[in-house]
Amino acid sequence: DNFDGVYTACAKTMTEVTFMRGSKYVFCETREAFQSARNYLENGNYVLYTGTPCEIAGLISYLGKNYEKLITCDFVCHGANSVAAYQSWLLEFTKGQTVKKLDFRDKSVFKWSTTATAYLENGNIIRENHENCYCCFDWTC
């Protein structure tokens, strides 16, 4: 609901997992996520923690011991913008309008495009195609 950054969330149902889908490209604010994961583990629950490789390393370091019921899943990190850079981009991209939904990679335009799409509260849609340096064939840049 709040587009000021990306935050770690806990889901107990598959419906709740749906809200976590999609590319983020911004450093994640873990807030109390590590502590929550530890609490769930200490209470004998399974925990699946998904994040960037550095977030997973941070969690394991924070926990300080192995937990049999901890499952971690990291993904290839293409680099993440700082929260300040993201907020600046979002303000410029939406011209300060209230965002209802944000897709960094809108697959409705082209299946794996680099089109960012903001669905605004007033019903308008803003799209912006941005460079994808990870699929660039210009090795001189």
PLM ranges: what are they?
Residues D1-C141:
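Iron-sulfur-associated redox domains of electron-transfer enzymes in respiratory
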